[in-house]
Amino acid sequence: MRIRKNITKFIKRAYIDMGELKQVKGYTKTRLNIISNKVFLLKQELYPLKKQKKVGKLKKKRVTTYTRKKLKRILSLLFRIGGKIYRRKIKKKKINLKKKEEHFTNNLILYRLFRKFYINLKLKQFKRLYKKYKGNEKIIIQQLEKRIDMILLRSGFVRSIYEARQLINHKHILVNGNIARIPSYTLNVGDIISIKEGSHKQNLIHRLKKILLPKVVPEHKKNLIHRFVSKGMDKYKYNYKQKYQPNDKAKYQQNYKYQAKRRRESKKKRRIRATGPKYLEISHALLLISLIEEPKLTAIKYPFTLQPENNIKFISLLNKYKRIR
């Protein structure tokens, strides 16, 4: 009677545990540890119920009761769900949650910064690049900068990556004379990007005239597009005659002299490169882009401090977290 009561208690407890476990589909390490601990406790209570073998007598067939069969089924189900379950009870360890949270949050912030800078890039693409170029993390950024959508953005032909992807999807862009259909296609050194002839080419020329040409230009030269190499455009930025009325001559002269000195001092520092970075060669007249060299980290301007050997390694730590996308 005592044995039956104990077994009925085990069965009820096991069914409750199985009901809790079956609600969740994915099993994490913590949940598997809970299963293994429960199995350990069940076994610890079941083993003393088994009859010990007597030495010197013939073996007889064991009579299995219905309750023992139930217990075997429950234990088999637990082993199937758990997979590799530990035979021994797992000991609890003290963990500093503050350290783990700080490490995880810093990595998550870096991932979000990269994602804002390289829009439409998912964690899977970062993982593939990290597996390929593990140890040389600087090459990962070079590969990201060689993409067609990023080169169009760096050259100044496009305002955002979304616009670049739209042009590629609508088949307006050519690479070495062939239509480019994949925005994530990486270019090689010597490849040339051009724009397909059509209505969009004229719209792009009209938009580039407003951006590249200075405001103070004679009318007979407005139809031309200059081939800029590196030209300081600060002197075309200010138009003081529009700000001040003709009566305020003293204010105009004082401000003009002060700004003239300031421009001479900061002429070398403040320069707008119409051609974009050094690893690209651009002709705005023909609307062509060619990749001369592999991009360097010094040529790229990031909104945050870039240490690829430290900052890109967070991708390997985020592999476990499937919810992050």
From Swiss-Prot:
PROSITE patterns, alphabetized: RIBOSOMAL_S4, S4
Domain S4 RNA-binding: 146-209
Protein source organism: Dictyostelium citrinum (Slime mold)
InterPro entries recorded: Ribosomal_uS4 (IPR022801), Ribosomal_uS4_CS (IPR018079), S4_RNA-bd (IPR002942), S4_RNA-bd_sf (IPR036986)
Source domain of life: Eukaryota
This protein's name: Small ribosomal subunit protein uS4m
UniProt keyword annotations, A-Z: Mitochondrion, Ribonucleoprotein, Ribosomal protein, RNA-binding, rRNA-binding
Similarity remark: Belongs to the universal ribosomal protein uS4 family.
Underlying gene: mrps4
SUPFAM superfamilies given in the database record: Alpha-L RNA-binding motif
Annotated GO MF terms: rRNA binding; structural constituent of ribosome
CC terms in the record's Gene Ontology section: mitochondrion; small ribosomal subunit
Signal peptide: none
GO biological process, one term: ribosomal small subunit biogenesis
Compartment(s) where it occurs, according to its Swiss-Prot or TrEMBL record: Mitochondrion
